[in-house]
Amino acid sequence: SGAILKNYTWDIADGNVKASVLEIDLNDPYVQLEVVPGKGKFTQRATVSNMANRTDAIAMVNGDYYNMKAEGAPIGTTVIDGELVSSQSYLTGVYCLGITSDRTAFVDEFSFSGSVIAANGEKRNLSGLNKTFYWEETTGLHSHIGRLHLYSDLWGGSKRGMDSYVGTPAEVMVKDNQVTAVAFDGGFDSAVPEGCYILHGDG
């Protein structure tokens, strides 16, 4: 009862145009909206129909934009179960659809700021969380050159933000806020282990 599918057809000179609209009642307690990343993690690509079948969803839409020539991770902000899992890229005019805890829908722009603090107290800014490489629209700079990025175990790929412009990055494995391993000369050649983070730096 909380989801109604409506189909529309418009006749035009060259034929007709069809549109399917799903009307959702956010006040219905039996309705739940979720974010579904690919086959379960970022970079693990899947079609919309495959994701719907895997999760038994009654409907699904492609809710973000992706650089399919890169790792296929979302460009925009992603929040799952109230936790930020993908930060906003430094691009202009990118809006996000969100649902608040009281089930109110909104559309707005987001920004991201983050930092890491070393044991000696030194602080460095983070440029992104679970982001593939891109060119920043505001500065024209490469997103990963001379920057720090953080990757969680939701990032399914063995490479993080790498393209031909990036040099030889170094990576730090973190678990429970403790450094467990360091990899120079290109970083770790594996996905992020469950319960861990990888801090990726270049330059």
Model-derived segments and spans:
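Gly/Ser/Thr/Pro-rich low-complexity, intrinsically disordered segments
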Residues: 1-203
